[in-house]
């Protein structure tokens, strides 16, 4: 039964909502209120490999489409996300809706809702006991193709210079029972809240600097911080660095082509965590495309 805690307990009960290393320029992944905030429609795909060097480490892939409607007072989006950890597989399909309220001449408040379906699959009979490498009879039958509802919400206050965002991407505790021992597991439990704030400073020669603070709070776990800064250069290049209180540092870069396609890369390295000696980092690639010219600052 030792592997049960590893295969399901830690991943199913202790895992936060999957989010991008380059979340600052892809805030719609964390907060549905950002969907449709831009001037035109957009597409984004990404892939992230966690903890390279560890067999069965998380692999996540994401694809999304977002567009404003009704003169940008509201927006809609559709996304699909896959997360594989060991033999555990999660596939989610979500729809987002956001609407905007103008507070005064300069300030806006935007709200967002997210709803979807999560498919969960875990081939327990293929897990093997160490060191004998034989199947555990307690893992029979498998957890196969459970479909569950997902729901999230968020809000963002913003103007041309800064934003303050808060969201809970998944607020529903989905549970199910497996095998003859009535083992139960929960998906995305406990809930995780994300509070983020960012300000854009205009420097010389067309350079802009954007510091960002992300506070991540999960019930039953310590609060941790992500401190980041992105520099926007006039050559359509942006570079960034993130420092996390969990003991890791992230470097990122993103380039926007003249046809409005953007390509981003990020690498995350553990610097004080015990896991550092077993892996060589986490890596993420992002490709985005705008269907027309024009884009607001926050994406």
Please annotate each region the language model reported.
Residues 15-299:
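Subset of outer-membrane beta-barrel
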Residues 1-7:
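Bacterial N-terminal signal peptides
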């Amino acid at each position: 039964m030792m592997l049960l805690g590893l295969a399901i307990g830690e991943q199913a009960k202790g895992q936060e909502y999957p989010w991008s290393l380059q979340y600052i320029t892809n805030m719609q992944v964390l907060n549905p209120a950002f969907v449709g905030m831009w001037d035109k429609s957009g597409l984004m795909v990404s892939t992230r490999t966690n903890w390279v060097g560890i067999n069965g480490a998380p692999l996540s892939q994401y694809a999304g489409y977002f567009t404003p409607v009704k003169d940008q007072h509201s927006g809609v989006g559709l996304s699909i996300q896959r997360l594989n950890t060991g033999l555990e597989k999660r596939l989610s399909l979500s729809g987002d809706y956001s609407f905007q309220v103008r507070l005064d001449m300069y300030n806006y408040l935007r709200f967002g809702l997210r709803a979807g379906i999560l498919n969960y699959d875990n081939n327990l009979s293929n897990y093997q006991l160490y060191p004998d490498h034989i199947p555990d009879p307690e893992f029979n039958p498998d957890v196969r193709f459970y479909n569950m509802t997902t729901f999230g919400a968020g809000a963002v206050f913003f103007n041309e210079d800064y934003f303050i965002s808060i969201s809970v991407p998944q607020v529903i505790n989905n549970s199910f029972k497996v095998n003859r021992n009535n083992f139960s597991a929960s998906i995305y439990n406990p809930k995780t809240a994300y509070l983020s704030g960012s300000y854009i400073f205009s420097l010389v020669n067309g350079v802009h600097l954007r510091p960002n603070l992300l506070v991540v709070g999960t019930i039953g776990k310590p609060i941790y911080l992500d401190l980041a800064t992105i520099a926007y250069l006039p050559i359509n290049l942006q570079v960034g660095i993130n420092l996390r209180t969990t003991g890791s540092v992230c470097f990122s870069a993103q380039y926007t082509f003249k046809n409005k396609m953007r390509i981003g890369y990020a690498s995350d390295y553990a610097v004080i965590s015990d896991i550092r000696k077993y892996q060589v980092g986490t890596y993420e690639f992002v490709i985005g495309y705008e269907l027309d010219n024009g884009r607001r600052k926050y994406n």
